[in-house]
Each structure stands twice: as C-alpha cells, then as structure tokens.
Amino acid sequence: MNKEEQYLLFALSAPMEILNQGCKPAHDSPKMYTGIKEFELSSSWGINNRDDLIQTIYQMTDDGHANDLAGLYLTWHRSSPEEWKALIAGGSERGLIYTQFVAQTAMCCGEGGIKAWDYVRMGFLSRVGVLNKWLTEEESLWLQSRVYVRAHHYYHSWMHYFSAYSLGRLYWQSSQCEDNTSLREALTLYKYDSAGSRMFEELAAGSDRFYATLPWQPLTVQSECPVTLKDVSDL
C-alpha cells in the first residue's frame, strides 16, 4: 500500500486526533500522536492489552453505538412516508425523540446513518495500537482498511463522513440526558461543543481544510490479513 492510500486510512480517525491537541497529533503518522509514547485506554475504553484492543475493534466496527439507530436509518430510506408514520406510531416518548432525530438527519447521513461515529473511533484505536506497541503498522493498516471499505460504501465524501460522525457524536452525548426534555433539546439543537467546533474548523470549515483536500476513492489494493490477525480475518 502506497503512502497516499495509507494517509487516506489515517484520515478515518482525524476527528479523534484533534480531541487531544496536547499529544501533538499528526495526520501522516501511523501512531497518530508524536508528543506521547503511550495513550491510556483503560479508564475510557476498558482496554488494557493487545487482545482487548483487537477484540474491541472487531466487535465495535459493525456493532458499536451506531447500531442502536441503524435499523431506523435503513427503514427511513426504504419506506414510504405512510409506512414510516405507521412504524413510529404508538412508541414511547423517548423512542419518538430518537425516531424524530433519525427522520431529521437521514438525508444528511444516508443509509449508513451514524456508522461514521464508530468508524472514526475504530480508526483511532487501530493507530493508538501502534503507539502503544500492541499492533505492528502492517496489522494496523489492515484493520483500518477494513473500516475504510465500510466507510466508502456508506458515504460519498469526506464531508459526508464527517457530518455522520458529528451526528453520531451528538447521539452519544445525548445518552447522558436523564429526562426526555433534555434529550429532546440535545437532539434538536445540533449545536457543537467546543471540541466539536474545533474539529469542524480544522477538518471541514472550508475548501482549504483537511477533509476538503482529500480524495474520496476506493483503495486500489486490499492487503491480505496478516497471519497474526487470523482470528479476526473475517472483519
């Protein structure tokens, strides 16, 4: 895999780079951060070693937070307005808030919904695995390539991908809302927090920003799964 395609894989996790400015993120670094020697994943992810990392990536690439709404996004795109109304009729108030969120964002996300939220994070873990010396660069690139294939299938540009990620992040943040009023407010304001604003500004705010300068294209070569990852070769 040439350097240009490696950089496309690294771009999957660019939003997560920006969350940790003090670690000296680098878009072209296999290990993501150049200012630290290790990134602690135990407290936030429950990941303590190589096996934990690989299993998390394997499981959450297709069964992460985005899966909560995946069926609704797919149904919205494949149903008539009447069928959609019938589907959501009679649900709980909290369930209705989520279906309204899906209906309001489905055109922006496409059938993939907010899967980009999980793809960004799995790309992040793949690169941090190199930083923490749990993965070789070859292993990391293969894992990222499996995520990239999915992202390229569901989204049509880096801006599309980032939009879906941002809405996924909003959904994840809303899970902390304890009552329906605050949940509805969180899912209808579409307001960036300071970190979200920084990500948007650096990645997507103009034609000269990082995501706007990258090609959105399929990989020319799909590398073979390393023997050391044979247990997850069906990713």
Curated annotation (Swiss-Prot):
Q: Can you tell me which family this protein belongs to? A: To E.coli YbeR.
Q: What is this protein called?
A: Uncharacterized protein YbeU
Q: Which organism was this protein described from?
A: Escherichia coli (strain K12)
InterPro entries in the record = DUF1266
